[in-house]
Amino acid sequence: MLWAHCGRFLRYHLLPLLLCRLPFLLFFQRPQWAHGLDIVEEDEWLREIQGATYQLSIVRQAMQHAGFQVRAASVMTRRNAVDLDRPPLWSGSLPHLPVYDVRSPRPLRPPSSQHHAVSPELPSRNGIRWQYQELQYLVEEQRRRNQSRNAIPRPSFPPPDPPSQPAEDARDADAERAESPHTAESTVSHDASDNAVRRRHERRRYNALTVRSRDSLLLTRIRFSNQRCFGRGRLRHPAGSGPNTGGPRPGGAGLRQLRQQLTVRWQLFRLRCHGWTQQVSSQIRTRWEESNVVSQTATRVRTWFVQRTTLWRRTWVPGQNPAAEAQELAIIPPAPTVLRQNEEPRQQLTGEETRNSTHTQREEVEDVSREGAREGNDGSRASGNDERRNNAGRYDDDHEVQEPQVTYPAGQGELNRRSQEENEEGGPCESPPMTTNTLTVACPPREPPHRALFRLCLGLWVSSYLVRRPMTI
């Protein structure tokens, strides 16, 4: 039996091996084959497969290390959770294993120099792709630069100094100047502290610049500047060219420029008056939502959380509404002191009368306290309001908070200080104390720390739901 096995081994295995290898060993003697090792030349296909497998293994190891889980995903999941700006790593590695990419708003593929350039499709009316808009803007910009690169540069003069802050709007009248890029592309920030009447929310939505599109503020700004540079009513000569600036064409702005400027100003004015109500701003994509592709439910959850945990307080900024401050409309007037029926406004008193009056005051106070005890409220009704308003000892940083600053009309503070010194020196005490219209400007009360901590924790918990889903291949 053993001999038969050996014979079989010789016949089937060893003999073919010798027949294959012996001619090489005899005729093509080479030093690297002398030791009989088999050196297989890897063909291209094998190398490619191995490279791809190696890459995939590296990717999987890295993802495992980072705590991702790799699992197959349905088409809908891929459609929602794929990052639109980057095609996945492994789509380009193997040309003969095509990866079919199903994603609904498809980003433009990078143009290849080998193919005929396809004309980009026009943005549809109802859904404008914001990536495409931005790309369009950049392309236009580069085209303009390339055109002006070969032109003969004209001598230009530096623009005049920008006006100081309060005179910001005075530049429309006399001195024209080139808009700084900051002024050219900026949205007007508007704090909701005006004394104006708020309209119904339908009207406010109707007045908005973007009504129903989820179109970013960034985009609106780009669209405005694009219209200003390339649109139908664009400025044919730059904004700085005017009588007071040197420039390519001296002389005032033409009618079209004026109309265009008026239009833009009017739009911005509407935007300011309307002041981004929550109704509209919830429909506008924030830059955070643009850079992270987020489902609508996640956005809604985030909005809900922000609305519940943000303290909305109308604050009053000093100097904001000078007319109202002059009449002291911004301040709640103190409650008027009610005189008793038998009481008359006090005259100046001598020393003896002062003693008598304090005595009668004491009696009145005792009277009132007896009545309060009879009614069973112990005066708590009177003092409860003050207790509620007194937040001393409520915050950790009470020692750092300054007293509310008191603003006097011009020169009044000095008069007060003098009269106080006179009183301290024992001057004429009979002179009536000066009544001043004091304006108290105080900051709105802050959030207590435990509420801030609650907001932080709730935010962390909710934002854990907004993290991208586990990565899919």
Curated annotation (Swiss-Prot):
| Record bears the keyword Signal | yes
Q: Where is this region: Disordered?
A: 142-201, 232-254, 331-437
Pull one GO CC term from this UniProt entry.
host cell mitochondrion
Subcellular location as annotated = Host mitochondrion
Task: Using the record, list the residue span of the signal peptide; answer none if the entry has no such feature.
Answer: 1-35
UniProt lists compositionally biased (Gly residues) regions at 243-254
| Pro residues bias: start-end ranges | 155-165
Chief localisation class: host cell
Entry keyword annotation includes Signal = yes
Cite the entry's keywords alphabetically: Host mitochondrion, Host-virus interaction, Signal
UniProt feature, compositional bias: Basic and acidic residues? 168-182, 341-397
Q: Which family does it belong to?
A: Belongs to the HHV-5 UL13 protein family.
- Assembly and interaction partners: Interacts with host MICOS complex subunits IMMT and CHCHD3.
General function of this protein: Plays an essential role during infection by modulating mitochondrial ultrastructure and thereby increasing bioenergetic potential. Mechanistically, alters cristae architecture by interacting with components of the host mitochondrial contact site and cristae organizing system (MICOS) complex.
In Swiss-Prot or TrEMBL terms, this protein is called Uncharacterized protein UL13
Provide the species name.
Answer: Human cytomegalovirus (strain Merlin) (HHV-5)
Q: What is the lineage of its organism?
A: Viruses, Duplodnaviria, Heunggongvirae, Peploviricota, Herviviricetes
